[in-house]
Amino acid sequence: MDAQAKKKAMFRSKLNAKKKDTRIDSPLVRYNESDQPVCRVCNVVLKSESLWDVHQASRKHHEAIDSLKASAAGVQRGSKPAETRPTKIEALAKSSNSQTSSGLPPNFFENREPARAEVEPAKSKNLEQSKHTIGSETNKSKGPLPAGFFDNQKTDSSNTKTTSEPKQSQTQTTGPETKPMVNGNLPTGFFDNKEADLLAHGIKLVKPDIKDEYKEFEKLIQDDLQVVDSRMEEEEVDAAETIEEEEQREQRSYKEKVEILKRKKMELKAARLAKRSKTSEGSVKKPKKTEEESPSDEEDDEDSAVDWRAQHL
């Protein structure tokens, strides 16, 4: 296990050294937490350093550079619109004043309540004047009428006041501030549209920002890529280990075969030497027999010669 851990560490150190050698030295590139190159202009994560040249030649990169240049030029021109804004506001104020002068008088709606307050004391003055006139007429026409006949006039006037007051209250309520009142709470899901339902319950909708969602999506992709890279590294390490083990096994099998062949060769050499020794021993024994048989052959030759002479005779 220690040897395997050392091998893995060596393999990873080699990979890290290769990555360091291929780093991009450019002011437009930065590296994130996972040692991936990121374009500072486009804020795009590159999968590898070899794609930097392709990204520089891309249309998106050039458009981002042009937008940065345009924004820098807009910052320099930002002081001019600030100076022109007050003139627009003054023009709007003049137009509103002209409308009020042509149609309704200025502060028409603001002075509406004091006008109502002036109407009420005028009405009270008219009532008092009517009382005085009625009293004078009664004083003139006093005679057979009983005393205190006109004392009930106060109650009549009070009744008239009470009847006039609710009318005034009604006119006040039917002013420009009349709004429909909703009694009770609506149940959830009353509206088919979710936005309208939430607004009816007083819940403000938060519109999702596309940029934030895109950044979250990029983070998820980066996390997935990190997981994939780690798995690839582990698989490469495991594959390297398995390849080394297979090579070692093949070498062992080849060594065993070589040893077996050497043994067979030695056995064959020994067998050949044994055969040669046997054949050499047999050849040594045969010449002795020939030497022993040679005098008998000479005798046979002499006998045959004697027989030949005898035949001629």
UniProtKB/Swiss-Prot annotation:
Question: SUPFAM superfamilies from the entry?
Answer: beta-beta-alpha zinc fingers
UniProt GO MF annotations:
nucleic acid binding; zinc ion binding
Give the CC-aspect GO terms. cytosol; nucleus; spliceosomal complex
Motif, Nuclear localization signal 2: chain positions: 274-281
The short motif Nuclear localization signal 1 is annotated over 5-12
Q: Tell me, what is an example of a GO biological process annotation in this record?
A: negative regulation of DNA-templated transcription
Q: Give the UniProt subcellular location, in the record's own words.
A: Nucleus; Cytoplasm
Q: Which UniProt keywords apply?
A: Coiled coil, Cytoplasm, Metal-binding, Nucleus, Repressor, Stress response, Transcription, Transcription regulation, Zinc, Zinc-finger
- Which residues lie in Polar residues bias regions? 155-176
UniProt lists compositionally biased (Basic and acidic residues) regions at 115-131
Q: Does the keyword Nucleotide-binding apply?
A: no
Give the Acidic residues compositional bias ranges: 232-248, 293-305
Which residue numbers delimit the C2H2-type Zn fingers?
39-61
Q: Which domain of life is it from?
A: Eukaryota
Q: Where is this region: Disordered?
A: 115-189, 232-254, 271-313
Q: Which residues form the signal peptide?
A: none
- In the UniProt record for this chain, what is stated about the effect of gene disruption? Hypersensitivity to abscisic acid (ABA) during seed germination and to methyl viologen (MV) at the seedling stage, associated with a reduced expression of the superoxide dismutase CSD3 and an enhanced accumulation of reactive oxygen species (ROS) after ABA treatment.
As recorded in UniProt, coiled-coil segments are: 232-271
**What induces or represses expression of this protein, per its UniProt record?**
Slightly induced by abscisic acid (ABA).
Tissue expression remark:
Mostly expressed in siliques and, to a lower extent, in roots. Barely deteclable in leaves and stems.
What does the protein in this record do?
Answer: Essential for breaking seed dormancy before seed germination. Prevents reactive oxygen species (ROS) accumulation in response to abscisic acid (ABA) and oxidative stress, probably by repressing the accumulation of ABA-induced ROS-scavenging enzymes (e.g. CSD3).
Q: What is this protein called?
A: Protein ABA AND ROS SENSITIVE 1
Biological source species = Arabidopsis thaliana
Gene designation: ARS1
